[in-house]
Regions:
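Conserved alpha/beta catalytic core and glycan-binding cleft of carbohydrate-active enzymes
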Residues: 108, 125-192
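Surface-exposed amphipathic alpha-helices with a cationic face
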Residues: 2, 68-77, 124-130
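Short catalytic/ligand-binding loop motif for oxyanion handling, primarily in non-cytosolic enzymes
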Residues: 17-22, 91, 120, 143-147
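Active-site-proximal loop/turn and secondary-structure-junction residues that shape catalytic pockets
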Residues: 15-17, 56, 85-89, 118, ...
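Catalytic domains of carbohydrate-active enzymes, especially glycoside hydrolases
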Residues: 1-15, 37, 106
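Hydrophobic faces of well-ordered beta-strands that scaffold small-molecule active sites
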Residues: 9-11, 81-83, 112-114, 135-138
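Aromatic- and acidic-residue-enriched carbohydrate-binding clefts of CAZyme catalytic domains
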Residues: 21-76, 89-107
């Protein structure tokens, strides 16, 4: 990774999540028979054991030590480690902040990509422990968070799905993608 010039890695949900979920859980949009189950390969939308690294991703029985060694190896090579968290609907924000504190303090995670409830963005951005931690959200109100003032430390980032979609079209060479690409390229608010 270092030889490729990569300076950060974002891990999709790497905490212990339940792989077998019912199709009636909120993660699934379409209703289905209650007895039908699906494998949740990615860790999105279900309740999880947020404080533990995913044991099935580890090569040994000690997933905790292995995860810590991985983060240390990334840091030794000048690569930051960010984690994506998808908290289940209804997860209290205080609990979510405790989870982020745990991963930052125990594993020295450099940042978090938080998927789901946008209200967590404001609380996380004001949290004393996370003040210098990279925080990435899908849609947050920078003006409300910063209250019209310039941020003292620019740690908030927006995961912009529109940009992601249009940059992919542009890179593939899709016809008519240039104007959309330039629009999203220029749209970079001062707040983040």
């Amino acid at each position: 990774l270092k030889e490729l010039g990569i300076n950060a890695v974002e891990l999709m949900p790497s905490y212990e999540f339940f792989e077998w979920t019912s199709l009636t859980e909120p993660a699934y949009v379409y209703p289905a028979p209650a007895e039908e189950k699906r494998v949740n390969y990615w860790g999105y939308g279900t309740k999880a054991l947020y404080f533990a690294p995913k044991a099935s991703y580890a090569a040994s029985a000690d997933a905790v030590a292995e995860f810590a060694e991985m983060v240390d190896a990334l840091h030794e090579n000048g690569i930051e480690c960010l984690m994506e968290f998808c908290f289940a609907p209804g997860t209290p924000s205080g609990f979510a902040l405790q989870v982020l504190h745990h991963w930052q303090l125990r594993y020295q995670i450099d940042g978090f990509h938080l998927v789901g409830d946008a209200s967590l963005a404001e609380e996380a951005s004001k949290d004393a422990l996370l003040r210098k931690t990279k925080l990435i959200f899908l849609g947050f109100d920078g003006a409300r968070i910063y209250q019209g003032k310039r941020p003292w430390f620019r740690n908030l980032g927006e995961h912009n799905q529109g940009y992601q979609y249009h940059i992919r079209r542009f890179l593939k060479g899709d016809e008519g993608s240039l104007s959309d690409f330039t629009y999203y390229l220029r749209r970079s608010p001062e707040t983040h």
